[in-house]
Amino acid sequence: MVSRLLSLVSLCLLGAKHIEAGVTQFPSHSVIEKGQTVTLRCDPISGHDNLYWYRRVMGKEIKFLLHFVKESKQDESGMPNNRFLAERTGGTYSTLKVQPAELEDSGVYFCASSQ
């Protein structure tokens, strides 16, 4: 049963500052079964047009997934496959959806923002 579980972990480590409200990402972690859908959300720092998604698989380096400017995708060269869908609504928050999730999707997912 444990081997059927898929852990998708979402942490906010990039782009946050103590001076102002930082990037907010949730859920902070998610454990799901293979085949289920997981949706991660990133709220950038207010006024930031650029939003980035990254993923780190255990034992490997952080990999770029995609970059938005406002609601427009600028570069999605790092998106793994067609089961991954990212959107940015009105240039504000972004969602990253994995459907259906597979074991190889396990990892730490990061988002960051910049002006």
Curated annotation (Swiss-Prot):
Keywords: Adaptive immunity, Cell membrane, Disulfide bond, Immunity, Immunoglobulin domain, Membrane, Receptor, Signal, T cell receptor
Chain's role: V region of the variable domain of T cell receptor (TR) beta chain that participates in the antigen recognition. Alpha-beta T cell receptors are antigen specific receptors which are essential to the immune response and are present on the cell surface of T lymphocytes. Recognize peptide-major histocompatibility (MH) (pMH) complexes that are displayed by antigen presenting cells (APC), a prerequisite for efficient T cell adaptive immunity against pathogens.
Extent of the signal sequence: 1-21
GO cellular component: a single term: T cell receptor complex
Complex and partners: Alpha-beta TR is a heterodimer composed of an alpha and beta chain; disulfide-linked. The alpha-beta TR is associated with the transmembrane signaling CD3 coreceptor proteins to form the TR-CD3 (TcR or TCR). The assembly of alpha-beta TR heterodimers with CD3 occurs in the endoplasmic reticulum where a single alpha-beta TR heterodimer associates with one CD3D-CD3E heterodimer, one CD3G-CD3E heterodimer and one CD247 homodimer forming a stable octameric structure. CD3D-CD3E and CD3G-CD3E heterodimers preferentially associate with TR alpha and TR beta chains, respectively.
Domain Ig-like positions: 22-115
Name this polypeptide is given: T cell receptor beta variable 14
Subcellular localization: Cell membrane
Disulfide-bond pairs as recorded: 42-111
SUPFAM superfamilies: Immunoglobulin
InterPro entries reported for this sequence: Ig-like_dom, Ig-like_dom_sf, Ig-like_fold, Ig_V-set, TCR_beta_variable
Any one of the GO BP annotations: cell surface receptor signaling pathway
Main location, first listed in the record: membrane
Keyword hit for S-adenosyl-L-methionine: no
